Amino acid sequence: IFNEPKSQPWTEIREYANQIIAVIRQYSDNLILVGNPNWDQKPHVAIGNEVEDPAHNVAYTFHYYAGTHGKWERGNAEKAIKGGLPIFVSEWGTGTADGKGTPDPEKNQVWQDWMDEYKLSSANWSASRINEGSAAFANESTLDTLVFTPSGELVKSFLAKNPDTYEACATK
């Protein structure tokens, strides 16, 4: 709900999310992802003022680009996690937030280690052939022949390290 709010305050995002959650819960108890201020980089602002979900199945989103973001953004997410909020990294990229530049393996490894430490689920940007540094596939890729970009190769190497079995998380 509300992907990448730019400058809206949490109170406004929360009010909107509560209305949408009430409608969704009439039909489904599936996980709902809720955005937060500054392009989903301030999930900690929801501590003590969480959205209302009768199914207790909400996660707060977090976005980063390894070439742009660092310790400050990780700190915001860590505050949220330590404050008891479930976090889902619903967008991360290997390059810069503007889509330019090339992946920095060292900065990306710092972020991957951080996600592993907190056992965070994530979705990488972008499994596409778009003309930007974070695209996973080169323009010559086809459905039959995938050609990975440097970003795609890096993401593929991270995904290859994922566990093949999982444990259920503790619930409140």
Give the location of each predicted region.
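Extracellular glycoside hydrolase catalytic/binding regions
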Residues: 3-121, 125-129, 134-163, 168-170
